[in-house]
Regions:
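Long, contiguous binding/interaction regions
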Residues: 1-59, 65-89
Length: 89
């Protein structure tokens, strides 16, 4: 439940995270590894993958069950900090 009236998200919840990076064979494995460090029950089989029209980038949409805002923030920080990641939305 949201502790603060200004919070827009109530935890725990499923939260979609979109990660965009340069197309490579290992990018999805990198994203899965990072998320697994924070979420025990992450189901990588449900990731939605979409390549860009020119084939240069790939986006992964991961529906992640998070318990707290802090947990979600740590996932974003780690994904954003990886050199192969371009954007995390």
């Amino acid at each position: 439940m949201a502790d603060n009236e200004n919070e827009l998200i109530e935890f725990p919840c499923y939260f979609p995270i979109k990660v965009i990076g340069k197309m490579s064979e290992e990018f999805s494995s990198i994203v899965i590894t990072i998320i697994n460090q924070h979420v025990e029950s992450f189901d990588a089989t449900k990731i939605e993958m979409r390549g860009s029209s020119n084939g240069k980038y790939i986006s992964l949409t991961c529906n992640v069950f998070v318990e707290t805002k802090e947990q979600l923030d740590k996932i974003y920080i780690d994904l954003s900090g990886h050199p192969q990641t371009q954007f995390v939305i």
